[in-house]
């Protein structure tokens, strides 16, 4: 019997995760076949190139931005899917074994829900959709349907195979510390968007790089871990590991700790998610243990980087509180990039919006509840940003 290729749908094909996924698939064409791509539209020429190289029909290409979609449609000689729901529609109209959701931000929520509804495996790089959707999203998933792409959660999933659920004592989530590790809060008032865009060990998109600089990204990952692995936030430790070699660890009840180690590259977790639970040979180079290595670990400076402790509180609140955390951050991060607020004020905005969240956040029984909570959080965040901006 011949090898059966998996049909893969890639959402966010022009981003860092999407382009690396296409590289993995190109190197393993006997295992995978791309049946559709979706993108926001900031790089229409790249979408055109990808579609042509993959031999995709126009109706298997989705672009959210209308102007970019028109450019892509003309180049491909047919009408592509366009609009804010383009990725969701592509999922609903394309038969796939696995959907890689690498869209940026909570805009990926609709596509995540559509994937779960379709029955396809969800290779989830868009952590924001899980954080925003919370238990509403996980309640829609079949056992094992969501496969994490984040290197940390991929590492957790791999380490968890070393024991049973009741043998897990603690989860250890590692963080690089970002470009401002060791800085005081006072020093960070002078941080520029250009400085925040320079990550010491990972190559990521603009928003993920900024979220890593504030450690909001680690907060999102803590919340994500509670949802993916159905564990309490207090059982998750966060440690700063600047070398980004150990991606996460699991400590078991007998005192053993299992760690997943590999060079900082997303190709391994991407490949593993696409073919889970099987490993893809030579997904990336392995560590050379005959060479000298120094790995260090240190606690998070919560005074300088309060985002992690804030996320721990949010994870305990459950319901739509994580959606508030994410939505307020998206607005504050964008305001910082536009020069409207200072770097430390990003998390300050998130914190203040959360303090009033009891007035509008709660349990979500429908996706509209999540969207309404997000909308209110964004409105409150922007009102606060407007006040802060006038004082700069």
UniProtKB/Swiss-Prot annotation:
SUPFAM superfamilies: 1-deoxy-D-xylulose-5-phosphate reductoisomerase, C-terminal domain (SSF69055), Glyceraldehyde-3-phosphate dehydrogenase-like, C-terminal domain (SSF55347), NAD(P)-binding Rossmann-fold domains (SSF51735)
UniProt keywords, alphabetically: Isoprene biosynthesis, Manganese, Metal-binding, NADP, Oxidoreductase
Pathway: Isoprenoid biosynthesis; isopentenyl diphosphate biosynthesis via DXP pathway; isopentenyl diphosphate from 1-deoxy-D-xylulose 5-phosphate: step 1/6
GO biological process: one example: isopentenyl diphosphate biosynthetic process, methylerythritol 4-phosphate pathway involved in terpenoid biosynthetic process
GO molecular function: 1-deoxy-D-xylulose-5-phosphate reductoisomerase activity; manganese ion binding; NADPH binding
Function comment: Catalyzes the NADPH-dependent rearrangement and reduction of 1-deoxy-D-xylulose-5-phosphate (DXP) to 2-C-methyl-D-erythritol 4-phosphate (MEP).
Entry's EC annotation: 1.1.1.267
Superkingdom of this protein's organism: Bacteria
InterPro entries on file: DXP_reductoisomerase, DXP_reductoisomerase_C, DXP_reductoisomerase_N, DXPR_C, DXPR_C_sf, NAD(P)-bd_dom_sf
Residues involved in Mn(2+) binding: 150, 152, 221
Catalytic activity: 2-C-methyl-D-erythritol 4-phosphate + NADP(+) = 1-deoxy-D-xylulose 5-phosphate + NADPH + H(+)
Bilayer-spanning residue ranges: none
HAMAP family found in the cross-reference section: DXP_reductoisom
Residues that hold 1-deoxy-D-xylulose 5-phosphate according to the record: 127, 151-152, 176, 199, 212, 217-218, 221
Protein name as annotated: 1-deoxy-D-xylulose 5-phosphate reductoisomerase
NCBIfam families cross-referenced by the UniProt entry: Dxr
Enzyme category, top tier: oxidoreductase
Cofactors: Mg(2+); Mn(2+)
